[in-house]
A protein has these predicted regions:
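Short glycine/proline- and aromatic-enriched beta-strand/turn motifs that initiate or cap beta-hairpins
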Residues: 17-77, 149, 232
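Hydrophobic, lipid-facing positions within transmembrane beta-strands of outer-membrane proteins
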Residues: 24, 47-51, 87-91, 136-142, ...
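Flexible, solvent-exposed loop segments that connect beta-strands
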Residues: 34-43, 69-86, 114-135, 161-180, ...
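Outer-membrane beta-barrel "beta-signal"
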Residues: 93, 192, 222-235
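Outer-membrane beta-barrel transmembrane domain signature
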Residues: 97, 120-199, 205-213, 233-235
Length: 235
């Protein structure tokens, strides 16, 4: 919740800047978590909610800040369902190279910062354990939007360099860090403008990430597919 408070406070001064555009959006979503952890398949069903604020300055600079919460369960090979929760804070800073008036599309390369924290509670070896994960990443991406009347269509493609990817199981004295430094994400949004201020948006997001233990033999790969629906307001 501290991330959400930070997001809301940061949006207040942006709405008062003249000759610029601000939008705030609330999204609800579902996520299917796939992939594998060693020889074991990953099978997760998560719900999510997200709040995102984006500001376009008159000098073509773009700043976006979002907070997302996910909760649900992963099903283990023995049929047990875990209790999974995560929080993600994502900052994007970009520069609009081309706008719809000049090019027919908006093109914005960006970088930023991502902080991800997760907790997965389960029973293993006859004990209740908690697997805690902490990840920090720096994304490098490009966002493209095209427009047709009230409809707009986009694509957001990014690679993120992980400065930290650590998983801990305190009760078992397990502390693992990944030597795999990159993750991949692509998202496809479709937006419909209801009126001058209000819009609806649907989005598909696919992410891929790998965890390779620096000192052991453990290897895991996540392949997540997420669908979100949201409503937004422009200022």
């Amino acid at each position: 919740m501290k991330y959400l408070l930070l997001l809301l406070l940061s949006l207040i001064p942006l709405t008062s800047i003249s000759e610029s555009k601000t939008e705030v959006m609330l999204n609800l979503g579902i996520l299917n978590g796939g992939g594998s952890d060693g020889d074991f398949p990953l099978d997760g069903d998560l719900d999510s909610w997200e709040i995102v604020g984006k500001h376009h300055f008159s000098n073509h600079l773009m700043v976006e800040l979002g907070y997302q919460s996910r909760n649900g369960e992963y099903t283990l090979t023995d049929g047990q369902d875990t209790d999974y929760d995560s929080d993600e804070l994502k900052l994007k800073i970009g520069y609009q190279l081309c706008d719809a008036e000049d090019c027919g599309v908006e093109i914005t390369p960006y970088t930023g910062y991502i902080r991800f924290d997760a907790e997965n509670d389960l029973n293993a070896f006859g004990a209740d354990i908690s697997v805690d994960q902490e990840v920090t990443k720096v994304p490098l991406g490009i966002e493209v939007w095209g427009y047709s009347g009230a409809w707009s269509y986009g694509a957001d493609l990014s690679m993120a360099h992980k400065s930290k990817d650590e998983q801990k199981i305190d009760v078992l004295a397990v502390d693992q860090e990944s030597e795999s430094n990159w993750s991949f994400e692509i998202s496809i949004p479709v937006r419909y403008q209801i009126n001058e201020r209000i819009f609806f948006e649907g989005r598909f997001i696919h992410t891929r990430d790998e965890f390779e233990d620096e000192v052991g033999n453990r290897e895991a790969e996540e392949k997540n597919n997420q669908f979100t629906l949201g409503v937004g307001v422009k200022f």
